[in-house]
Amino acid sequence: MTSTPSKSRKSSKGSKAAKAAASAPETRPLAKTPPPFRNRVVDKKGLKQLVAWAYKHHGTAATSAMADQLKDLGFRYATQAAVSISVNDLKVPEAKQNLLGQAEELITATEESYRLGVITEVERHTKVIDTWTETNERLVDAVKKNFNQNDPLNSVWMMANSGARGNMSQVRQLVGMRGLMANPQGEIIDLPIRTNFREGLTVTEYVISSYGARKGLVDTALRTADSGYLTRRLVDVAQDVIVREDDCGTSRCILVKAEDGKYGNRLVGRLTADQVVGADGEVLAERNTEIDPPLSKRFEKAAVQAVSVRSPLTCEANRSVCRKCYGWALAHNELVDLGEAVGIIAAQSIGEPGTQLTMRTFHTGGVSTAETGVVRSKLEGTVEFGAKARVRPYRTPHGVNAQQAEVDFNLTIQPSGKGKPQKIEITNGSLLFVDNGQAIDADVTVAQIAAGAVKKSVEKATKDVICDLAGQVSYDPSIQPREVTDRQGNITHKAQRLGRMWVLAGDVYNLPPNARPVVTAGATVTEGQVLAEASQASEYGGAIRLREALGDSREVQIVTTAMTLRDFKLQGESTHAGEIWNLEAKDGTRYRLNTIPGSKIGSGEVVAELNDDRFRTQTGGLVRFAPGLAIKKARSAKNGYEVNKGGTLLWIPQETHEINKDISLLMITDGQWIEAGTEVVKDIFSQTAGIVTVTQKNDILREIIVRSGSFHLCTEKKALERFQGDGVMVNPGEPIAKGISTETMVYVQTVETPEGSGLLLRPVEEYTIPNEAQLPDLGHVKQPNGPHLGLKASQRLAFKDNELVKSVEGVELLRTQLMLETFDTTPQMTVDVEAVPDKRAKTIERLQLVILESILVRRDTISDSSHGSTHTELQVEDGQSIKAGEVIATTQILCKQEGVAQMPEATADEPVRRLIVERPEDTLTISTNSQPVVTVGQRIVDGEELAAGQPSDCCGEVEKVDSTSVTLRLGRPYMVSPDSLLHVRDGDLVQRGDGLALLVFERQKTGDIVQGLPRIEELLEARRPRESAILCKKPGTVEIKQGEDDENTTVTVIEADDAVSEYPILLGRNVMVSDSQQVTAGELLTDGPINPHELLECFFEDLRSRKPLMDAAQEAIAKLQHRLVTEVQNVYKSQGVSIDDKHIEVIVRQMTSKVRVEDAGDTTLLPGELIELRQVEDTNQAMSITGGAPAEFTPVLLGITKASLNTDSFISAASFQETTRVLTEAAIEGKSDWLRGLKENVIIGRLIPAGTGFSGFEEELKAEAGPHPDILAEDPAGYRRMQNLRPDYTVDMPAAPAGDATAVLDDPSDADMEATRSRHGIEAGSNFAAFARPDADNELKEEQVVDAEAVEGLQEEGLLSDE
């Protein structure tokens, strides 16, 4: 049975299948004719066609067997022929050296014209890259030719050529050249890899090569993730598109136009929407004809220009697509079944090739525009432009001056001799390389014809021009620089015209900031002469100290102010914590130094602190200020509070233990009296006796406080209330309660203990704080004109009134500190702390505080390139005393080589910072044989004539002309393009490596700047591009108005009803229309990416003025849909991926199915609501019947993410993104989910409504079968119906003998057969195909009633399936 294929399967693949189908008659008996014999090379494409043909004619089983045999065949012959690759198979073509040589020559020429300032840096770069790209292409051709002619059976060549593995670009890298690589930013490196993998790469090339390779790997890794996410979004948006109807009956359709008279695969698998009539009037197909490849070919033969077909885009089935609009299911080339989940198939078809797309965004700096549409002259003659010709000067990206046509016209070349003139059609935007009336030779490039009206969009890019030699800048007058002030008020200079900027050679010296030139402009200088001098002076004066030299500079210190503490001895002692320095006064008081000698301190910092134990407490406690004690308010308590006025400080000791452990470790109770040394918590002991207070929170012990004192039980309510809370100070002799009094001052508090309430009398310690710190006289040092220096003592309290000090150990209550005071205007002045021996007793060290002024003096430098030689002289000696403003050192800048000094004019705000010496080698005197033809001040480049027949061999400016010689000042020209930013002014001096200008150039935005996956995503998510093009809102005629300052342009469109709309064009935008051109709605007025939302709006607004709302919406959406489908297809096609249109259409249908309600009219809709177009249509129809006001709406385009979140099913939306938001909204709005899609059903665990779970599936089976009795219901022991038989081909059997239900039955007799036939109305001619009956084991056996013709007949009618 395998060889009798099923229902003729139609193949969308190759032409062979088509031929086979066409050659066989339509109603052929199966496989009676032998298959046609084909003898040709079967490469990858042929193999595809062969398998497709086998599948179409012979079904799956036969095809898979054949494929297996083909595989074995391939392996067998490959083994016999021993096809393998060795190094010797990689044959490098002979032509390679030659091609590389030509490229090198071209590039040398380009570099030369750059050096001569004929082209700009940008044009050079573009030209170099284009040259290499072209060389690479030519090399590929050479490789192909080499293999084809010399070694067609080469393993590498066969492999790549047959499509088994690899492609031409890989072969190119193996035996051609690796070519240009991009750096990680996507810019092309203009150093190509000239070698291939066979020859091996040099080190440089290897590094550049790995650049590109790394990028490829990273790309692939990112691509898989991106592509997966894209697929997920697509599945989510289209998962509920299921084929639910047979025919929606719509009259709408889409038009598929032939491209170059061919349809390719674009019609295959679609159904026609109208009659298709050929050019001669013959009807080729009726409505709803399935188009298979042969029919598509017939359309092409009959020259049908466009076919209207049904499409998912226009299908009117509710919430789904119907079979007729969808067409073939491409898996088995027949009309799609009901219940097929076409949405998911579409999503996967678009998402799966995602991994094959590139992620690249290339910034090529002008893509190779090498030889597009170049027209050469065929004869010698004179060029004539037509009468209506309009051209404007244009400079090509390679720096060639040409003219660009502004209108379409004809160019003729009138022959100089006999012959027919050559006519060339010039289109708008084409480039002309000849002038009107110019005489030209044959085979000269005349023009480059622009491809159609594709004005490529351009973007602005910049490139720096870097100076190659030091010298003086001089502009060509042609540049016409102008000042431009931007919004921030910065002034920049811009070139207005194309021109050269010269740098005339010379030795440029950078002067230090405070140097002044000592030579005059134009003076002749000799080597070693002083050009400029800089001096360094002291600000305050003082004693000089010279330090050793460090590196290339030397420090001179000037002691401005010094102060020695004569009354103190300085003593250092070492401890384990480092060195501690003490100051000891004559009376024995000691201060601890806070800094160490040799360090620097600032004003207000603490120098030393008094060592004083009088104010140290035993434990923590409470601070109380007695009246009279006052402190300064301080911003931060870090350094304590300064005492304003002395007095008494009261201290109530208490011991605080911070614990922060579990409560179970507590060993005492709250309120208990404990003795000193009691363990309160494991391993923590009390230092004093007293009453314990325990603080706890959440079963964690926070603190334990021990308050010492004497405790008295007390029942007197009044007394207890008086001392409640914080407690009260009680002076000696004051009564406290009955029987309780005190001799000293106490602090009384009420406490609760396990024994009962009582009063705790806590001891109070008194500390007397003096008004001023008692310190020896420190004195101040005052300078008449320098900074002052002094020390002052201050007392600082560590705590403020009522502060509780939580501590177990004691604390310092009062600190006495020595602080530094500089009374000076310079806050940043630092003071050095030094230890100096006493002048009288050398063994005793004293503390000295000095203020130093430090000056760095540069050493002599032997000529470094930019400063020239410098020579520095110190004017002072060690220990010398100087006054303020005296010079300490002078630096002289010496001339390196003799010459003539020049310098720019000095102005008040701009002192001279550079000067230039014009050396002998910067000029060149050339003797001429005849009178020179140049004038002084003229600028010459290589090749220009100095005198008759004497070209110059260098660039420069003419300085002197004699009758027999010319003196040139050498220089280097740089071409700058219009609108470039000039970084230097005319006459400025520049060093080598300085930036001269920033070239602003336009580079073609190639369509693939955003290509591959990011572009697909951009389209499907309907992203709004950043700088989108300006679109025309209404059709009309264009008028272009230039603004007065040449900057802003306005495009006005005069519409049909004489209304005028103005479109102001921003700076830097190119206008894409010309004057008096007719434009339609949605047409581009400027270049740039299109905003699809805006486009839809333009279409809708325009149509709405002419058509009813519903039609306008549908037509606007249809236009946008067509555009989206084409754009997406273009991306995939550019990568060589073929996807059937219908898949993209299913997705686009989902993106454009909604409209936004603008005005609800009398309907129940809400303004701003997104709703399906169909629903609004139904609602508005109801309104027109009842006479209510219909709803107004505008169509919207939703990106796939937005569309997924806006589906009717909230379960599906919530499972996609923003779960909480979707569910909350659904709950608030009380939404119901009708479970129409697949996802919803999967999530709640039901059968999905597609395939066999499709609700219409059962009914469809029954409807096909017609009414019939169920045999089993009549007679359980009789024959059963087999699955693959149509119900009406079932045999009724006589009942089994009553005794045995499982008896083996005899074959039915003729009479039985006759009876069954008559009962079911089956004509007598037809035999039964098959029947089944239970045998002894009650298992069904299938038997054939042998009648081959009947079987084939049934199969032909499609009533029997393969099995």
Swiss-Prot record:
Role summary: DNA-dependent RNA polymerase catalyzes the transcription of DNA into RNA using the four ribonucleoside triphosphates as substrates.
UniProt key word tRNA-binding: no
Entry GO terms, CC: DNA-directed RNA polymerase complex
Region (Disordered): 1-39
Keyword Transcription on entry: yes
Pfam families: RNA_pol_Rpb1_3, RNA_pol_Rpb1_4, RNA_pol_Rpb1_5
Reactions catalysed according to its record: RNA(n) + a ribonucleoside 5'-triphosphate = RNA(n+1) + diphosphate
Subunit record text: In cyanobacteria the RNAP catalytic core is composed of 2 alpha, 1 beta, 1 beta', 1 gamma and 1 omega subunit. When a sigma factor is associated with the core the holoenzyme is formed, which can initiate transcription.
Record-level GO BP terms: DNA-templated transcription
Family membership noted in the UniProt record: Belongs to the RNA polymerase beta' chain family. RpoC2 subfamily.
Free-text remark on how the cofactor is bound: Binds 1 Zn(2+) ion per subunit.
UniProt-annotated binding residues for Zn(2+): C248, C315, C322, C325
Name of this protein: DNA-directed RNA polymerase subunit beta'
GO molecular function, one term: zinc ion binding
Uppermost EC category: transferase
Skewed-composition ranges (Low complexity): 14-24
Protein origin, superkingdom: Bacteria
Organism, scientific name: Synechococcus sp. (strain WH7803)
EC number: 2.7.7.6
Cofactor(s) annotated in UniProt: Zn(2+)
Keywords: DNA-directed RNA polymerase, Metal-binding, Nucleotidyltransferase, Transcription, Transferase, Zinc
